[in-house]
UniProtKB/Swiss-Prot annotation:
<protein>
    <recommendedName>
        <fullName>GTPase Obg</fullName>
        <ecNumber>3.6.5.-</ecNumber>
    </recommendedName>
</protein>
<keyword id="KW-0378">Hydrolase</keyword>
<dbReference type="InterPro" id="IPR036726">
    <property type="entry name" value="GTP1_OBG_dom_sf"/>
</dbReference>
<keyword id="KW-0342">GTP-binding</keyword>
<dbReference type="InterPro" id="IPR014100">
    <property type="entry name" value="GTP-bd_Obg/CgtA"/>
</dbReference>
<dbReference type="Pfam" id="PF01018">
    <property type="entry name" value="GTP1_OBG"/>
</dbReference>
<feature type="binding site">
    <location>
        <position position="193"/>
    </location>
    <ligand>
        <name>Mg(2+)</name>
    </ligand>
</feature>
<feature type="binding site">
    <location>
        <begin position="213"/>
        <end position="216"/>
    </location>
    <ligand>
        <name>ATP</name>
    </ligand>
</feature>
<dbReference type="Pfam" id="PF01926">
    <property type="entry name" value="MMR_HSR1"/>
</dbReference>
<dbReference type="GO" id="GO:0003924">
    <property type="term" value="F:GTPase activity"/>
</dbReference>
<dbReference type="GO" id="GO:0042254">
    <property type="term" value="P:ribosome biogenesis"/>
</dbReference>
<feature type="binding site">
    <location>
        <begin position="191"/>
        <end position="195"/>
    </location>
    <ligand>
        <name>ATP</name>
    </ligand>
</feature>
<dbReference type="InterPro" id="IPR006169">
    <property type="entry name" value="GTP1_OBG_dom"/>
</dbReference>
<comment type="similarity">
    <text>Belongs to the TRAFAC class OBG-HflX-like GTPase superfamily. OBG GTPase family.</text>
</comment>
<dbReference type="InterPro" id="IPR006073">
    <property type="entry name" value="GTP-bd"/>
</dbReference>
<comment type="subunit">
    <text>Monomer.</text>
</comment>
<dbReference type="InterPro" id="IPR031167">
    <property type="entry name" value="G_OBG"/>
</dbReference>
Length: 329
């Protein structure tokens, strides 16, 4: 299973229609003047944010998007029809960059937001434009211009306020499933989650807050190891991170350090993002082992971890209280 959150496409505006050479042909007007109409303008290519889309999967199978051309002009100064814009739907949270230069062209965040990425060519001029005192029967017209053509890089970043991070198998999918109505695939082996899962958790006010279960990181993720860069970018837009540590892992403290190191190496302000350290799977620990592990995690991170059992539903109210407090809701 592959989460398509990057795509490369080419967009091409429609070509303008040609102007034409024509003359009035009317009864009793033996020498009618020029009447060639202009060509219509080529259609633009427009990207539009759509809240019903979750991935860029559609762009895996189609890479070239060409808008329709304008129609050629007609006699009697009739202008050819201009092309209607080609509207391409993309998920909310899609960044659009010029593939060659890397320049950010736009960030489509809100539903219905639009960005014109290739303008159509202007229509050519008919010979009616070239009538003058010195030339009463011009035979000149111009062709329509080509539309713009650009290679684009699309990147999708999840729009979630809270990101749940941790090494594979830390229990992130279980946590988001019990906190929200999301039902991600859950199994007891690493890398079950290959697609970021979104869930809406209700605040005390009744409003919803979007949580994202970010697939498991591994050492070297910031340099692109595993699924690193593909998923670290999704954390950038979150306001708060829940760092989940598996209490049943061979080295929970080492796991904590791996994730912290990757956040620091990736940059983009992630290491300074407000974060809650949460120790999951308390059902695997006796009292002495729990207290010892909590002390070691606190010594390593400088923060006292919250203790929960996602599978048993324990400690979740206290966790959410901390989340709402840090979000200021």
């Amino acid at each position: 299973m592959q989460f398509i959150d990057q795509a490369r496409i080419t967009v091409r505006g429609g070509r303008g229609g040609d102007g034409i050479v024509a003359f009035r042909r009317e009864k009793y007007v033996p020498a009618g003047g020029p009447s060639g109409g202009d060509g219509g303008h080529g259609a633009d290519v427009v990207l539009e944010a759509d809240s019903n889309l979750q991935t860029l999967l559609d762009f895996k199978y189609k890479r070239l998007f060409a808008a329709i051309d304008g129609r050629r002009g007609g006699p009697n100064r009739c202008t050819g029809a201009s092309g209607q814009p080609l509207v391409i739907k993309v998920p909310c949270g899609t960044e659009v960059r010029h593939l060659t230069t890397g320049i950010l062209l736009g960030d489509l965040t809100n539903p219905g937001e639009r960005l014109t990425v290739a303008f159509g060519g202007r229509g050519g001029l008919g010979n009616a434009h070239y009538l003058s005192n010195r030339n009463r029967a011009p035979e000149k017209c111009t062709e329509g211009r080509d539309g713009e053509e650009w290679p684009l890089q699309l990147e999708l970043k999840l729009l979630a306020e809270v990101g749940i991070i941790g090494l594979p198998n830390a229990g992130k999918s279980t946590l988001i499933s019990v906190l929200s109505a999301a039902r991600p695939k859950i199994a007891d082996y690493p890398f079950t989650t290959l697609v970021p899962n979104l869930g809406v958790v209700r605040r005390p006010s009744g409003d919803g807050t979007v949580f994202a279960d970010i697939p498991g990181l591994i050492a070297g993720a910031a340099q692109g190891a595993g699924l690193g860069h593909d998923f670290l970018r999704h954390i950038e837009r979150t306001r708060l991170l829940i760092h989940l540590v598996d209490s049943g892992a061979d080295d929970p403290v080492g796991d904590l350090r791996v994730v912290e190191k990757e956040l620091e190496a990736y940059g983009h302000g992630l290491v300074s993002r407000p974060r809650l350290l949460v120790l999951n799977k308390l059902e695997l620990l006796d009292e002495q082992g729990r207290d010892d592990l909590l002390e070691r995690l606190e010594a390593s991170s400088g923060h006292r971890p919250l203790l929960i059992s996602a599978v048993m539903g324990k400690g979740l109210d206290a966790l959410l209280d901390q989340v709402w407090q840090l979000l200021g809701v």
